[in-house]
Amino acid sequence: MEDDKDIYTKDGTLDIHKKPANKNKTGTWKACRFILGTECCERLAYYGMSTNLINYLEKQMNMENVSASKSVSNWSGTCYATPLIGAFIADAYLGRYWTIASFVVIYIAGMTLLTISASVPGLTPTCSGETCHATAGQTAITFIALYLIALGTGGIKPCVSSFGADQFDDTDEKEKESKSSFFNWFYFVINVGAMIASSVLVWIQMNVGWGWGLGVPTVAMAIAVVFFFAGSNFYRLQKPGGSPLTRMLQVIVASCRKSKVKIPEDESLLYENQDAESSIIGSRKLEHTKILTFFDKAAVETESDNKGAAKSSSWKLCTVTQVEELKALIRLLPIWATGIVFASVYSQMGTVFVLQGNTLDQHMGPNFKIPSASLSLFDTLSVLFWAPVYDKLIVPFARKYTGHERGFTQLQRIGIGLVISIFSMVSAGILEVARLNYVQTHNLYNEETIPMTIFWQVPQYFLVGCAEVFTFIGQLEFFYDQAPDAMRSLCSALSLTAIAFGNYLSTFLVTLVTKVTRSGGRPGWIAKNLNNGHLDYFFWLLAGLSFLNFLVYLWIAKWYTYKKTTGHAL
């Protein structure tokens, strides 16, 4: 009988037929190969459409560079904000598998509409030479398609990484160790898709046409759907645990109702379900922590709670695990906030890096011209280089000195990436200083491009990619690991909203800088003609903000308390 029990997972996961998940038939890498294939194709579709979006808006939709930059940042921000919707639905009602399955329909609808708007006569802008004129209706269709995609990705992005991690049982030490590698390879395949998008698809868009250039990503998304459903029999599914927002609100209400109640010194007197498992479906019990103690009042039993045989209302009395869920989320918020500036730095690859690249010599040999947006390929190559190097070389090397099983703690890993991101902005700033000096020396103010090769941008892209491997992958693992079991989609979405706010911060900074520096008839830092501007000042601003952000992060990380679990999930 003991052997029979050992073949099933102990984290409460089920198979697609709603039976306890068999370790030998479900989960681990045999399930993750389908999830990784899905993510690779979905990211190819996303980046195949988004990488060159600023050029599409500027050249096809005839938008001015500042307007195009803000539109891309706002849309990108929305793509990383909508995951809150998908995460709530996944954790509360559908579970991760069925949430992904539902939202891919919206995603494909948006991709299809965008492809049609770029290829069907009457819906495409009228062009005369290199100048295009989009009508209000054509612009509206384009943005409806884009925001359908943003909604669709909201149900996929917060669920797919958590769904992959669900395939490894935390109670099994061997599987738990493999989960850390999963996040590295998950980010690796994201960048395989991004590499194809930023090279092949951008070239198609600039040299063949936008119809084909957006049609191929749509087909890639369809292939992602096939990959996802093909693995259904191998997946382990976590049961949705009910609305986490309701549970957190119950703790707040109950603790406020008992604001005058004294918390017992003996924490064992706080209310908790007496069973081995948590009363929250899909969640293990959480140990009590001695921080944010005001919320412990929600778990203090009073005479009114014990009156009558009926179970006390959850709006009056909450379990310790329920209280600790709220505490865990609050503890994550300061770490989350420090990711906003990093995300703002990352977002420059799709906006001002491209605008800077447009002013440089894009020729590679006499006959081939590389699109400026394709330089993001070097960010991707950097990630593809550093992800396996980190997993296979850096972790074993660091483990010898730190004694930590992962080489670095998750917070140390994130911090290293924050430092590297500062140098990426310094690199971009140095290049812009050199570019402007060349313009001034040779009086090239009215030239669209100058004879400086675009490959001088490679270091700044490469540094951003290196920073991603440390910070973004570290955040993926950190927010999954530190999230309460029944709130993992929500906390994964929370990490993504930092990217959303980073994009919105970028929009705010561009708007503020443009308004202030263009006053009095001046060209401004981000001028219509960058040769007359000072884009280098914008990069110094971001480098300074990143440095201050890192100092704040160090203080926050020093005081962070990691969560502790007990028991098994229902």
From Swiss-Prot:
Q: In which tissues is it expressed?
A: Expressed in developing and germinating pollen grains and ovules.
UniProt note: phenotype after gene disruption: No visible phenotype.
GO process annotations (BP): dipeptide transport; pollen tube growth; protein transport
Q: Name one GO cellular component term.
A: plasma membrane
GO MF term set: dipeptide transmembrane transporter activity
- CDD domains assigned to the protein according to its UniProt record, in alphabetical order: MFS_NPF8
Listed SUPFAM superfamilies: MFS general substrate transporter
Spans through the membrane: 100-120, 136-156, 182-202, 210-230, 335-355, 370-390, 414-434, 454-474, 493-513, 537-557
Xref: InterPro entries: MFS_trans_sf, POT_fam, PTR2_symporter_CS
The protein's UniProt keywords, in alphabetical order, are: Cell membrane, Membrane, Peptide transport, Phosphoprotein, Protein transport, Transmembrane, Transmembrane helix, Transport
Domain of life from the UniProt record: Eukaryota
Q: How does it sit in the membrane?
A: Multi-pass membrane protein
Cellular localization per UniProt: Cell membrane
Task: Please list the residues that carry the modification Phosphothreonine.
Answer: 99
Q: Which Gene3D superfamilies match?
A: MFS general substrate transporter like domains (1.20.1250.20)
Function summary: Peptide transporter. Mediates the transport of di- and tripeptides. High affinity transporter. Involved in the uptake of peptides during pollen germination and tube growth.
Fetch the PANTHER family from UniProt.
OLIGOPEPTIDE TRANSPORTER-RELATED (PTHR11654)
What's the family? Belongs to the major facilitator superfamily. Proton-dependent oligopeptide transporter (POT/PTR) (TC 2.A.17) family.
Q: Tell me the protein's name.
A: Protein NRT1/ PTR FAMILY 8.2
- Source species of the chain: Arabidopsis thaliana (Mouse-ear cress)
